[in-house]
Amino acid sequence: MSVMDTLVSRRTYRRFAQKAVPQDVVDDIVEAVRLSSCGANRQAVRLVVVNKPEAVAKVQPLVKWAAYLPPEQGTPKADELPTLYVAVVQDTSIPGDLATDTGIALANMTLAAWDKGVGSCIMGAINKPALTQLLGIEEPQKLAFMVAFGYPAHKAHIVPLTAETGVKYYLDENRDYCVPKRSKEEIAKYL
């Protein structure tokens, strides 16, 4: 698959098959973050890998799913939950643009996972105080995001953004995600 094909097909996934993500894929996710570009090569992004079933179960009530959908549609059911979470942590003792470096790391890790057929959901609507305690994250480190991983149990595809759709994703008749995206003409100016 070409890089552009990967970018088109790597969407957010919120329902997963109950199949563990193999350790070699977890290792690729970690390696993708380790290799990430970052400002001044400061490497301030850290990870906490949560892949033991009992630990994954403790994370689940501390994250929120699919803000644009009613919970009964957007929240995965017990047999659709992710089998792996990765906490993305910023080391605030290292100066630099942590937001940009974190964004690059998030892109790398989700693309590395998707290369192996593992879907992901980057989650910012999380209970940071409770997760920080649960995951043993201490100052000067700060929890930024949780990322859910697993083998997708639904499809997701890009649709044109229109006045009718707006930016909100929605489910089609098969419970697959439709993700409106702006046109190239709307996002790029050529001089």
Q: Where are the model-predicted features located?
A:
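Acidic, surface-exposed loops and disordered segments
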Residues: 1-191
